[in-house]
Amino acid sequence: MHCPFCSAVDTKVIDSRLVAEGHQVRRRRECLLCHERFTTFEMAELVMPRVIKSNGSREPFNEDKLRAGILRALEKRPVSMEAIEKAVNHIKSRLRATGEREVASQLVGNLVMDELKSLDKVAYIRFASVYRSFEDIREFGEEIAKLEK
């Protein structure tokens, strides 16, 4: 690690601890040349799988698109941003846990529905109606009946 003060190559770690719920390492370092101290944060670079769309095209996973879809379903619903971020992170974690380089968009959609089902039933129905392309009121009723079981 280069010293940000004198650009020396040699530094030593004085203290290390886990932060951000164990997802980051905070290290306190000291330059061996100028003796200045500084802090670094390290986290693993976790690669998200590519998404295979229903038309067969492939695109990089887009966290903003995921969040926007969830926010659209939860519009004007009493769900905190903290809960939404937790859901987004849980979906990303589950996608990484597949160990696959590519995942079907259907898997992403199903994971979103699982999260919405536990967050807000109305948002779940909203998302399901678009995701599953409900054609009539009967399909809404069937999905609501599944929720009530």
Curated annotation (Swiss-Prot):
Listed GO biological process terms: negative regulation of DNA-templated transcription
Domain ATP-cone: 49-139
MF terms (GO), sorted A to Z: ATP binding; DNA binding; zinc ion binding
Superkingdom to which the source organism belongs: Bacteria
One Pfam family in the UniProt entry: ATP-cone
Cofactor-binding details, from the entry: Binds 1 zinc ion.
UniProt keyword terms in alphabetical order: ATP-binding, DNA-binding, Metal-binding, Nucleotide-binding, Repressor, Transcription, Transcription regulation, Zinc, Zinc-finger
Cofactor(s) for this UniProt protein: Zn(2+)
ZnF start-end (unnamed): 3-34
Coiled coil start-end: none
Function: Negatively regulates transcription of bacterial ribonucleotide reductase nrd genes and operons by binding to NrdR-boxes.
Protein family: Belongs to the NrdR family.
Identification of the protein by name: Transcriptional repressor NrdR
Organism in which the protein naturally occurs: Aeromonas hydrophila subsp. hydrophila (strain ATCC 7966 / DSM 30187 / BCRC 13018 / CCUG 14551 / JCM 1027 / KCTC 2358 / NCIMB 9240 / NCTC 8049)
